[in-house]
Amino acid sequence: MLRELSVLLLVAVCAAKHVELPAPFKDHCILDDKQNLYDPSKQFDIKWYDVNLDLPPSERWVQIATANKEHIADLIGVLINLITPWFPNAIDFVDDVFGDLAPKLAQPYRDEIFSIANATGIPLGQITMYNIFYEIFTVCTSVIAQDKDGHVFHARNLDFGLFMGWDPVLHDWQISQKLRKMIINVNWLKDGKLLYKSNNFAGYIGIYNGLKPNAFSLTADDRFQLVGGYYGILKWVFGLEADGKWMSWLARETLETKTTYLDAKEHLMNTPMLSPVYFILGGSKKDEGCIIARSLDKTALLTEMATSPHGWYLLETNYDQGTEDLYLDDRDTPGFRCMDKLTQKNVGFEGIFNVLSSRTNLNKLTTYTVLMSVETSRFETILQSCPGECYPW
């Protein structure tokens, strides 16, 4: 299937800005069918846990790690099995190199990762690798939109597992299959109170999506650059930037320490980091929404909702705003088309979920959709997949 699809796309690309995919893989907005796939009860399929920041770092993740240790071990095992044919000594390399580097991690992440390794019985190097490999290649769609009354909604699909083991029986990516079993929601507590919310893969201590009540919401999408996540990992592995900030740790730091939309924006725009990223930031007030396109040491591009060409929404996949997507990976065009069909009067959890449940923003890599409202502190994670003949990414 993948071979025939690739040939068709290669033939079509010569003069096309947006390549219409061949049936049955073509883009499709379910709003055209007057479908509603949003079922709020599905949020309860995802379990909630507490991470208490008042506890020592060595104690914060023990419950989560213990409850999910089989899933964590299974995922890491699949990862190593995928790497081993190309790198026969992969497991020794991971155990030795990442194990030796773990003590050099910044606190509190160092103690948290050590405790997860202890609670699961999984070697320290493997838990360390698990906590940074999301920095390399995560393809996603994030949306910030406001309704006619200026209420802001923030959502994203998280797509992960590209080229990580195609399952010819289930027609799905092996890593994506494993990750769907590991999705959790987290209440982060401080001084006995809720500080912020996130969803995570069990045992992963960074943050890709988070909401701080009455302050801001945050998602992070990979930004593919020549000097990208691999470069940051190599710098870290060779000790050139042992205390550097991974993008998911910078997101977590922002949620823990910043109290307003503007403070969070300034911090995300200006803090040096190890991997390029798009930070999509939402607030609780009208027009509070932006896309921060980050390089390693600065902001390359800032796009504000108040000046968006779409007027009432921003949509980010993994390309700079205003640039053309790679023809094999154009999720912007179907996303824009479906958002325009939604219209501003239908903005809300239901409407945006249906946009993100439309192909190809929904694809074989999609593991979940998260929906957030800073104003109401509402945070929902809904498991996603794209069964049948669906585009692989």
From Swiss-Prot:
Task: Spell out the reaction equation it catalyses.
Answer: an N-acyl-sphingoid base + H2O = a sphingoid base + a fatty acid; an N-acylsphing-4-enine + H2O = sphing-4-enine + a fatty acid; an N-acyl-15-methylhexadecasphing-4-enine + H2O = 15-methylhexadecasphing-4-enine + a fatty acid
Q: Which Pfam families match?
A: CBAH (PF02275), NAAA-beta (PF15508)
- How does it get modified after it is made? N-glycosylated.
Top-level taxon of origin: Eukaryota
Where does the record say this protein resides? Lysosome; Secreted
Q: Which GO terms describe its biological process?
A: fatty acid metabolic process; sphingolipid metabolic process
Q: Which InterPro entries match?
A: Acid_ceramidase-like, Acid_ceramidase_N, CBAH/NAAA_C
Catalytic machinery residues = C140
Q: In which pathway does it act?
A: Lipid metabolism; sphingolipid metabolism
Glycosylation positions in this chain: N118
> Which Cys pairs does UniProt list as disulfide-bonded?
C29-C338, C386-C390
EC number of this enzyme: 3.5.1.23
Gene Ontology molecular function terms on file: fatty acid amide hydrolase activity; N-acylsphingosine amidohydrolase activity
Instruction: State where it is primarily located.
Output: other
Instruction: List the GO terms this entry assigns under cellular component, sorted alphabetically.
Output: extracellular region; lysosome; membrane
Keyword Signal present in the record's keywords: the answer is yes
Q: Where is the signal peptide?
A: 1-16
Cite the entry's keywords alphabetically. Disulfide bond, Glycoprotein, Hydrolase, Lipid metabolism, Lysosome, Secreted, Signal, Sphingolipid metabolism, Zymogen
* Site residues by UniProt (Important for catalytic activity): D159, N318, R331
Entry similarity comment: Belongs to the acid ceramidase family.
Per the entry, what this protein does is: Lysosomal ceramidase that hydrolyzes sphingolipid ceramides into sphingoid base and free fatty acids at acidic pH. C.elegans contain specific sphingoid bases, which are unique or different in structure compared to the sphingoid bases found in other animals. Two examples of these distinctive compounds are: 15-methylhexadecasphinganine and 15-methylhexadecasphing-4-enine.
Q: How is the quaternary structure described?
A: Heterodimer; disulfide-linked. The heterodimer is composed of the disulfide-linked alpha and beta chains produced by autocatalytic cleavage of the precursor.
The protein depicted here goes by the name Acid ceramidase
Natural source organism: Caenorhabditis elegans
Which gene specifies this protein's sequence? asah-1
